[in-house]
């Protein structure tokens, strides 16, 4: 039996804790936020509830396998498959209700966008499926190391299917000739805050997985998943502590020996599992290690520093009443801008945060079935996406008090029924910046 410290109680950390505890190890989980789940969080306000992170579950079998491996299905966690995954409204007024089952999608595309569109999308998904079978095991089900990467590309077939030299947009162009289908594919690049014209082709496996395995929701919010996994880990003997920040991961004799919290408490460990941002983890590693290890850590830290940060969208969490019946049954609604490329052009060359598009025309999302006793809650994601900016002080994080100290901004609503109307951020409970932006005070440009 080993003593294990898990740093971070996001879903990955909680799942690792549950599996390790089921294997008989002594497990302690340390989370700096007041609650577990990381981005998988639910905001509750006056009878309303909002998913503040992911709002869909794909590949539910992965979750089922976790619970089966650690004791069986949990009580009180119910998954619902969405019959309509998303309602898309394009700039030309076309409305597409995308089914939640892959076999129904071609007919829906033909009906909404015109004959032949379903065949174009089906061809794309068939290619994406072949890529999925190449990348799933090495990238999703195995540790990625220098030894495992060559195995994936050892055959010309695997390399050709992945086509890493193509962008997501270029990969899709081989199948898609309707610009609205191109928009549909491009949207999946925004899942990672990326430009589809630069994002790597393997992102095409995201729509494949979503449409092959279905779009699922958890009544009460996806945060219920984090609650259930925490309960499973604790039932198996793991100890979960929130509000505890790890300041340092100690090393000695060429291996980790434990962690030190920001309060100075030292916790010994045979193994440390880090469910945290890579840059943070490399920053936690202390210098008490052999020269070779320190050099490798420094090199890894340097490589992480060169990575391009992803982007996030400005999100409003709105408690809505009196919604039309046709909107109540739609879990997600995306409103595409008339010039979708214009959004990406405005975002990526800029060095500063800037608004892109408007509420009436920009990409947005209305998410959430009835979430509270007083009516449905909704999350509207506005295409107001900003590039990272220099900061003068880091404070707070995903669920820390720092987010409350952000100066209230204003969103101008153009093209709506009230021209010139302003929505000060301080007046909307739940109005959010992306997590990375909420954790810093920006420097003036």
Predicted regions and their residues:
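N-terminal glycine-rich phosphate/pyrophosphate-binding loop and immediately adjacent elements
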Residues: 2-134
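A short glycine/serine-rich beta->alpha loop
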Residues: 45-49, 192-193, 214, 302-305, ...
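Glycine-rich phosphate/pyrophosphate-binding beta-alpha loops
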Residues: 54-60, 189-190, 194, 313-315, ...
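Rossmann-like flavin
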Residues: 91-199
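C-terminal lid/capping helical subdomain adjacent to the catalytic/cofactor pocket in oxidative enzymes
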Residues: 163-164, 175-179, 197-203, 214, ...
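Helical element adjacent to the flavin cofactor pocket in flavoenzyme catalytic cores
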Residues: 205-256, 260
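Mid-domain catalytic core of redox enzymes
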Residues: 247-365, 444
